[in-house]
């Protein structure tokens, strides 16, 4: 049976991990969201999140976005290539409702799966 957890090993934890992804990423974007990816040498994908106070002033709004992103990653992790992913929230992300945000994330994950198959 497949475990759909989001343990510590599936997270980008240090600034070095984030810096690695930001150096030469593959990108998939919408106006509200960008997912950056870079292949890693591990047997699983990892996720990092950046949601700036500049775009979402209230902590509960930032937490909602991060919670939905983590949940989307958790459910898609076995389809995803072995890459380090960083989700960058942009201006206007707070206007998306939960369903729209989830659909947007699913579309971006599919785009990264296709990008990984091409390379």
Swiss-Prot record:
This protein's name: Ribonuclease P protein component
Binding partners and assembly: Consists of a catalytic RNA component (M1 or rnpB) and a protein subunit.
Organism of this sequence: Pasteurella multocida (strain Pm70)
Signal sequence range: none
Pfam family, one: Ribonuclease_P
Family matches, as InterPro entries: Ribosomal_Su5_D2-typ_SF, Ribsml_uS5_D2-typ_fold_subgr, RNase_P
EC number: 3.1.26.5
Transmembrane feature ranges: none
GO CC term (a single one): ribonuclease P complex
Role, per record: RNaseP catalyzes the removal of the 5'-leader sequence from pre-tRNA to produce the mature 5'-terminus. It can also cleave other RNA substrates such as 4.5S RNA. The protein component plays an auxiliary but essential role in vivo by binding to the 5'-leader sequence and broadening the substrate specificity of the ribozyme.
Reaction(s) catalysed (UniProt annotation): Endonucleolytic cleavage of RNA, removing 5'-extranucleotides from tRNA precursor
GO biological process, one term: tRNA 5'-leader removal
Similarity field: Belongs to the RnpA family.
SUPFAM superfamilies from the UniProt entry: Ribosomal protein S5 domain 2-like (SSF54211)
Domain of life per record: Bacteria
HAMAP family: RNase_P
GO molecular function: 3'-tRNA processing endoribonuclease activity; ribonuclease P activity; tRNA binding
NCBIfam families for this protein: rnpA
Gene designation: rnpA
Key words of the record: Endonuclease, Hydrolase, Nuclease, RNA-binding, tRNA processing
Enzyme class: hydrolase
């Amino acid at each position: 049976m497949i475990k759909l957890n989001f343990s510590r090993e599936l997270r980008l934890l240090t600034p070095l991990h984030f810096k690695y992804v930001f150096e030469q990423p593959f990108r998939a974007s919408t106006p509200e969201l960008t997912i950056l990816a870079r292949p890693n040498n591990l047997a699983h994908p990892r996720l990092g999140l950046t949601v700036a106070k500049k775009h979402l002033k209230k902590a509960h709004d930032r937490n909602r976005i991060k919670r939905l992103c983590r949940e989307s990653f958790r459910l898609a992790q076995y389809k995803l290539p072995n890459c380090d992913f960083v989700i960058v929230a942009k201006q206007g992300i707070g206007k998306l409702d939960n369903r729209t945000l989830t659909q947007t994330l699913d579309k971006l994950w599919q785009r990264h799966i296709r990008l990984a198959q091409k390379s």
